[in-house]
Amino acid sequence: IRNFLFLFLFFSGIIFISIIFLPSLLLPQKITLFGGKLMGYWSQYCLKIILSTKIVVKGKDNMINDKKFFIACSHQSMFETFFLQTVFNSPVFILKKELTKIPVFGWYLKKIGSISIKRDKITRDNLNFFEDISETTQNSERPIVIFPQGTRVLPDDRPPFKKGASRIYEKLNIFCQPIAINSGYVWPKNGIKKTNKVITISILEPIKPGLQKEEFLQVLEKKIYDELDLVG
């Protein structure tokens, strides 16, 4: 019953916020971004109140505040995309091109400046992908978010990180903020949501620019997976 109630209230709230903020599609971007933050806070409220989830944030002292950076985050559930909007300055997400074609939802994704890519196909857009993220980083204070695992994974899965993460690190030549989140134990990509659990968000020590691509990927993967193993 609590699982059904969570899904019903969560998605009802998201739909309500989306409708209320429809006029923002014609207004300055910052208004639409505020709607995204509300969705982030709503998701946390539903988790805490309905599923009795405890949300713990570790490593706030590791947060980068005085320089440009991008975020590399583990990905186990929808939680990450909502939560990160409440902690960082309206981050820019990299997502599948197909998502931008969904009515209403796709309009929002375009309005907030999401960077899209068509997977598994060589297109002109894909060839310009790294130029797009570089331009976004140079012209905005909003950090880009990447999910180096490539897709949502089960909590105990440890797939190797995608090489695209290291190419982004090399292209941007800025700090990387690694983040480990074990949300899959509460909000799995498939299956019933769990009650009375803890979601731990670990903001890890930044990785400086200048490493070789291969070394960066090894360091990033070890940092995130070691932390996930630690918090369980």
Model-predicted segments: where are they?
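Catalytic core of membrane glycerolipid acyltransferases/transacylases, capturing the structured
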Residues: 17-29, 33-37, 49-50, 65-122
